[in-house]
Amino acid sequence: MRLGIVLGLAAALTVAASGAAAQGEAGRLTIELNKLEPQGEACRSYLVIDNATEVAVAELVLDLYVFNRDGVIERRIALDTREVPPGKTQVRLFDIRDIGCGEIERLLVNGVLSCRDADGERSDCEDLLALRSRAGVDLDG
C-alpha cells in the first residue's frame, strides 16, 4: 500500500445526486468512485453514495488507501462520509493532496473506522458496503 499516513478527515461536500448516477443494490450501501478531476496540486474525487438499506447511518468513516501506478501506497485517508440517510443518494467530494489524478491506480477501502446510527456504534457496516468505480481507477475493498 502507499507510504505515508494521512488521518486528516477529508473535507466532504454534499451535492444532490441525480437518481441515474448510481442506483445501488437493494439492502446495500453502495459507494461508487464516479469521477476524478485535477484540482491544483490535488486530485478531486467524487463519490456517489447510495443507501439502499433501512439503516440511517449517522456517521461512516472509511479507512481509505491510495495506490500509485507502481502499486505503492501514496496515502492513507480517514474519509468521513458524514450522514447517509436511508433511501438517499448523495455525492461526497474530497481532495487527495499532492498527487495528480493520472498517478492514481487504485483506491482501497481497507475497512470501516467508525459507523454509527441513532442508537450508537454499529458493527455490520462493512458487510453492507458494495464498491464500484466509473472513474477508470479501481475502488475495491
Regions found by a protein language model. Give the residues of each.
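Intrinsically disordered, low-complexity Pro/Gly/Ser/Thr-rich segments with frequent PxxP/GP/PP motifs
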Residues: 67-105, 115
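Bacterial N-terminal signal peptides that target proteins for export
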Residues: 1-8
